[in-house]
Each structure stands twice: as structure tokens, then as C-alpha cells.
Amino acid sequence: MHIDVIGHGPALVLLHGWALHGGVFAPLVERLAPHYQLHLVDLPGHGFSRDDSTPLALPYVVAEIAAATPPAVWLGWSLGGLFALHAAATLPQVRGLAMIAATPRFVRGSDWPDAVQRELFVQFGTELSRDYRGTLERFLALDTLGSAHARSELRSLRETLTARGEPAPEALQQGLSLLERTDLRRALPQLARPSLWIAGQRDRLVPAAGMHAAAALSPHAQALTIAGGGHAPFLGHADQVSEALQRFVASVP
């Protein structure tokens, strides 16, 4: 699995979202690298890990990342948040958890109302096999929908998407399955590490209310909503997100 290591200081592992790669965090890298050693992961089937055949399953991927990185705060955006949360719940080397536009459960349920309908991910999976590039384009548009900086964020995501080659279709299907089926809520009350939950006020994929609900289930948690932010608030609101991350990491024992 490809992992870029940039900067010096306390270690921070960054995990990207569906269909993208570690390069998507460029605005955060610019602001955080002077202060931290950043470990930017390309998940299997994505970016420079496109040919990595490791199944996109939480235990396998987390174990491989943990073996290649030092004790660190783990940050997960969107799909990457599931891997980061699983790591925080199972590995002592995870010092803290930062979730950006990610919750333990991405789909709506009778006891989890602030999420999207399951059919959204099922539909993307069906369309992916028929129209690969068109489906990716529609997902990127959903990532930025509602954001105060939607146009510039969409342009950035489009440029990033194929900068390291196209993601593997099999990995994309596995990722959609994770988003559709994973429910890690039971792990939250037992989280021994501090956590930070950063939501976008206008996020159409992961409503801010869902992130605040997840934080409320977690001990040692704090939640922050980025005004005007969409599903990728670290793009259009990089200063605010990076400042929140620096305050959080500084508070982690």
C-alpha cells in the first residue's frame, strides 16, 4: 500500500474518501506539514495503490496501515473515516481520532435518521458497471453539492481524481458496499481515545446532525460544524479545518 510521508513532528495518518487518494488532502498538507509528520495513505485500488489487491475490508486495511506507520492520530474523511474509526476502536497505537464528514453509519435507519438512504449507494454501484466515468463525475458533484465553494471544490476533485490513475472498479464496488453496510456505532461508547468530529454545515452525504450524534455517543469527543462547508470542507475551508486539527492534536495526550 502506497503511503507518502511528508513533514516533521507528531505523526498524523490521513485516509481519503471513495474513489480518490491521498493527494486530495493537498490543502491540509500545505498547512500541516510544517508541524506534523503526515502519513498520506492511498487505499487499495486507489491512486498509487491501484494494483494493491488487499481487500477493501476494515481489518485487513487497518492492520496493513498500522504496520507501516508509527503511533499517531488517525484522520479519516468520508469512507476513510470508517477505517480510522475501526483503528481507533481496536489499536492501542492510535493516539486520537479525527473524523471529517464521516460517521460510524452512513445510511439512514429508524434509530439513525441523520444519514442518506441506502439506495443511494446501491444506485451508484449499479451505475458504476454501466457508466464508470459518469458515475464518478456524479459522485464528485454530490461531494460538493451545497458548499459555499462548490465550483472550486468540484474543479479540485476532478483534477485530483485521475492524477494518479483511475481507481480500480472492484475497489470502488467494495467501498460502496462498506458505505452501505457498515455500522460501527457500538464502538463509540468504548472509545478510549479523544476524538474530533468535523462536519460541513451543507453536507448532503453526511449531515452535520449525524456527526454531532456520533460525537455525543463518544467519550472525550468534541464536534465542530464548518459554516458553509460541504462534504469536503478541508478544500474550501482549509484554514478553519487545519486550525481545528492543530488544536485537537495539541490536546491529545
Curated annotation (Swiss-Prot):
GO terms for molecular function: pimelyl-[acyl-carrier protein] methyl ester esterase activity. It comes from Xanthomonas oryzae pv. oryzae (strain KACC10331 / KXO85). Keywords: Biotin biosynthesis, Cytoplasm, Hydrolase, Serine esterase. The gene is bioH. The keyword Cytoplasm applies. The keyword Cytoplasm applies. The active site is at 78 (nucleophile), 203, 231. It holds the Pfam family Abhydrolase_1. This is Pimeloyl-[acyl-carrier protein] methyl ester esterase. Substrate binds at residues 18, 78-79, 139-143, 231. The lineage of its organism: Bacteria, Pseudomonadati, Pseudomonadota, Gammaproteobacteria, Lysobacterales. GO terms for biological process: biotin biosynthetic process. The physiological role of BioH is to remove the methyl group introduced by BioC when the pimeloyl moiety is complete. It allows to synthesize pimeloyl-ACP via the fatty acid synthetic pathway through the hydrolysis of the ester bonds of pimeloyl-ACP esters. SUPFAM superfamilies: alpha/beta-Hydrolases (SSF53474). Belongs to the AB hydrolase superfamily. Carboxylesterase BioH family. GO terms for cellular component: cytoplasm; membrane. Pathway: Cofactor biosynthesis; biotin biosynthesis. It is found in: Cytoplasm. Its EC number is 3.1.1.85. InterPro entries: AB_hydrolase_1 (IPR000073), AB_hydrolase_fold (IPR029058), AB_hydrolase_sf (IPR050266), BioH (IPR010076). Monomer. It catalyses: 6-carboxyhexanoyl-[ACP] methyl ester + H2O = 6-carboxyhexanoyl-[ACP] + methanol + H(+). Its main location: cytoplasm.
